[in-house]
Amino acid sequence: MGRKPSPRAQELPEEEARTCCGCRFPLLLALLQLALGIAVTVLGFLMASISPSLLVRDTPFWAGSIVCVVAYLGLFMLCVSYQVDERTCVQFSMKVFYFLLSALGLMVCMLAVAFAAHHYSLLAQFTCETSLDSCQCKLPSSEPLSRAFVYRDVTDCTSVTGTFKLFLIIQMVLNLVCGLVCLLACFVMWKHRYQVFYVGVGLRSLMASDGQLPKA
């Protein structure tokens, strides 16, 4: 009869599977979510400070705030009570909640990218001029009563056509990367859940077949 491996030897492969260069891979995703969420939030408030007439959808600090909440939950779960094979209802509930919030973060980031891309496409066509303490922009049109977009409290239109346009590009890039990180977090949570399930089924069937073998 072969010697059974010790419980410590059985735990080593499982611990190695949870780590990546000494750090748990889901933990890296949560840290990335936190860094990107803070960057998107700060940049959103900077964009809002350019003009009070900007809509909330054009300054997506709300997207960064949601991703920060997701990251805080992920850090708490991964640093305190994370187990690949959840053993309590609390661990399972936290993993499901983190999965759902990451999916929400993905949708919100993609929505922020769409809003920023739409506003950027408008700015690329605008013809702007300074009027008193505002910047008035119009789309090129042959109609004399074409719609005008007014950015209040702007003394120089270059802050709209230059600085704000650059902020929109950065927001699109940051939110796109943030959405991809949230998607990867959803995939990791799903993979851990169902990979552990099928591995557990395989181990039980293997143990059952070993138990049916005749003893030497």
Swiss-Prot record:
GO CC annotation, single: sarcolemma
Q: What is its main location?
A: membrane
Q: For side Extracellular, which residue ranges?
A: 48-59, 117-166
InterPro entries from the entry?
CD20-like, Sarcospan
Membrane topology classification: Multi-pass membrane protein
Q: Which UniProt keywords apply?
A: Cell membrane, Membrane, Postsynaptic cell membrane, Synapse, Transmembrane, Transmembrane helix
Q: Which residues lie on this side of the membrane: Cytoplasmic?
A: 1-26, 81-95, 188-216
Q: Which GO terms describe its molecular function?
A: protein-containing complex binding
Q: Where are the transmembrane segments?
A: 27-47, 60-80, 96-116, 167-187
Q: Does the keyword Membrane apply?
A: yes
Question: What PANTHER family does the database record attribute to this sequence?
Answer: SARCOSPAN
Q: What does this protein do?
A: Component of the dystrophin-glycoprotein complex (DGC), a complex that spans the muscle plasma membrane and forms a link between the F-actin cytoskeleton and the extracellular matrix. Preferentially associates with the sarcoglycan subcomplex of the DGC.
Q: What is this protein called?
A: Sarcospan
